[in-house]
Amino acid sequence: GKSLLANCFMEECGLNTVAVRRDKGGDAFINSIAQAFAKAKKEAPAILFLDDMDKFANEDDSRCDAPEYVAVQAGIDDVKESDVFVIATVNEIRKLPDSLCRSGRFDRKIGVWAPTAADAEAIIAHYLSGKRVSDDINMKDLTKMMSYHSCAELETILNEAAIRAAFARKDSIGMEDMVGTVLKQQYGASEDVPLNSEGAVKKTALHEAGHLVACEILSPGSVGFASLLRCGGFVHNCNVLPNSCEAIVALAGKAAVEMQYPGQLAEGCGRDIKRAVNCIREAAANVGKMGFSLLDVESDRSVCMSESLNVRSEAVVQAELERCYNRAKSILSRNELFLEKITEAFIEKKTLLYSNIQRIRSATVKDSTEIAQETVSQYHNEDEDLDEARKESIRR
């Protein structure tokens, strides 16, 4: 996106342009930087374009005095009195020396952020406009299923889908090609579920359905893609949830299996539990959600957590884990039909798109406003109970 924006700018200006990219190393590259500035000065009015400038040097972040950056600074200073306009693209501006980024060398900084959902939909439509696509392409599903950080990433996926369709000797790109490409490119998923017993597949489907249902109830419309076509399966959440909700969603897979199979402990939940613990600890450390009793006030310079703080922290983390697990079970029990239908859909289709999920949700879940009210009411009482549990843990 950054290089594309710069190229469009240079094309619209209609001036002579000189581009510098790191295509060689050592002294040869440093010399090419000096030569590029000299050429731009000679051909003025001109634009000098430094592409991916943060990759000009291989020094670590603490060494910003690399000779490549010194050469750029010297070049900018040399063309100051000439009609040479210098622009650059960078991915990590923190890697550049402050002296290079200050006013007088680079006066304007323009942030180019990752595409929003609306941006991604427009970008996908643009790239597909020159390709033959089938009628089953659903733009909303396409946008929701992808994790996108740049235009180039979206373009790569769409080109790979076109190659896949051509390899299969199809006349057009279909939704199947898109789904298969996204699974492979972004999730590292094989296209066939490993041969497991029917019971194992059902438990995996139930586990992922638990995550999905909890996520959809806490944040309606947030799940854009989910599949069993990877070891353990996955659920792609399009929205960022608060840490407390993330912890509930993380434990909902375990809750779903243990509710369906009473007396059995769900296997393979270690990663989910670790994720929930991390969410709880982050909420306690960063925003003080668990109260000031978990803040280490003995020394603001202490490197390690004090023993007393560690005892208090672990007690509250365990209590919070229990609360989140119980909230997950409560959500799933109140949305049993939704959980059942999602599990069945997982077993049948293996991969669920946004439209599949929303179709099942609308048929099985009551109005989200009503759910939200019920949730707030029920969780208020649970929070009061937890406060007492925390106080008792701290007293102990």
Regions found by a protein language model. Name each.
Residues A57-E59, P97, V182, V213, ...:
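Activation segment
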Residues Q35-A38, A74, A122, H126, ...:
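Generic recognition of well-ordered alpha-helical segments
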Residues M10, D51, V72, F106, ...:
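Residue-level signature of catalytic and energy-coupling elements of molecular machines
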Residues E59-D60, D98, L158, C215-S219, ...:
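Short, function-defining helix-loop hinge/capping sites that tune catalysis or transport
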Residues I163, E176-N196, L228-R230:
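Active-site scaffold of zinc-dependent metalloenzymes
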Residues G1-T143:
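Walker A/P-loop NTP-binding motif of AAA+ ATPase domains
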Residues A200-L206, L212-R396:
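Soluble catalytic regions of large protease machineries
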Residues F85, D98, V112-D177, G253-E258, ...:
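Conserved C-terminal "switch" segment of AAA+ ATPases
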